[in-house]
A protein has these predicted regions:
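Inter-motif core of Ras-like GTPase G domains
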Residues: 92-112
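Conserved C-terminal guanine-recognition region of P-loop GTPase G domains, centered on the G4
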Residues: 115-140
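Beta-strand-loop-alpha "switch" segments that mediate conformational coupling across diverse proteins
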Residues: 147-194
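NTP-binding/hydrolysis catalytic cores, primarily Walker-type P-loop NTPases
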Residues: 188-217
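Switch II (G3) loop of P-loop NTPases
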Residues: 77-97
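Conserved beta-strand segments of the P-loop GTPase G domain that flank and frequently precede/overlap
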Residues: 11, 34-35, 84-87, 104-109, ...
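Walker A (P-loop) phosphate-binding motif
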Residues: 3-29
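Short beta-strand-centered segment that lines the nucleotide-binding/catalytic pocket of NTP-utilizing
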Residues: 29-45
Length: 217
């Protein structure tokens, strides 16, 4: 019998860097991304193994795999690592409600709207899955200096408290050119490291990914 599968979903009704985080995580966990964003053909440009999930398929979760079905075919999705990552578009796919992910990662940029939407996303998830384990990520893509960073983290924490989400962990993802490069060069993070002597620059991202993994494993 297969090992139990761990399902991880990146979600936010607005943008917050969901796909970038999904990619970093998939690379580190050596697993596959299920892309639910119908506007993006991630299969085409993700180097990390990615499967686009068509709208017309139903999804059923078994202990060690997911089963995709339409009228004529059935497809089993199973990974060697036993981890599977669902990357959502800008809405919460109804099919994911029943799947009850083991972890939900909700990334947010630092602007008011993005933060509000990430809180709304968390409420929505908890309404359907009261035991949901949520990890908030404040994405510092637009934060340029330490003072702003400290202010923004404080602001974000205030939102967390007001919404009663203190029991969940919040991680900070530092600003990095890495995400852009991963797409432009169509490569993986670890392959990039050798190419540019920028280990130091990416150390913060490594640290972020390691912290994220510790919460999941």
């Amino acid at each position: 019998k297969g090992k139990q599968m761990v399902l991880i979903t990146t979600a936010n009704f607005r943008s917050g860097g969901k796909s970038s985080i999904a990619r970093l995580l998939a690379e580190k966990l050596n697993t596959t991304i299920l892309n639910f964003d119908k506007k993006r053909d991630s299969e085409a440009y993700n180097v990390v193994s990615t499967i686009n999930i068509p709208e017309n398929k139903s999804i059923e979760r078994k202990e060690d795999c997911l089963i995709l079905r339409d009228k004529t075919t059935e497809q089993t999705i199973k990974t060697k690592s036993n981890y599977l990552i669902c990357d959502l578009g800008g809405y919460f796919d109804e099919r994911l409600v029943d799947l009850k992910s083991d972890f939900y990662i909700i990334p947010s940029f630092d602007d008011y709207e993005s933060i509000s939407e990430s809180m709304r996303t968390a409420h929505y998830i908890l309404k359907n899955n009261i035991k949901a384990k949520i990890i908030f990520v404040l994405n510092g893509a637009f934060i340029v200096d330490k003072t702003t960073k400290d202010e923004k983290i404080k602001e974000f924490q205030e939102h967390i408290e007001v919404n009663g989400f203190n029991r969940f962990t919040t991680l900070f993802l530092p600003k990095t050119a890495l995400m852009r490069k991963l797409v432009d060069e169509n490569t993986k993070k670890d392959d990039l490291k050798g190419k540019f002597e920028q280990n130091i620059k990416y150390k913060n991202v490594d640290k972020f990914v390691d912290e994220l993994i510790k919460l999941i494993i």
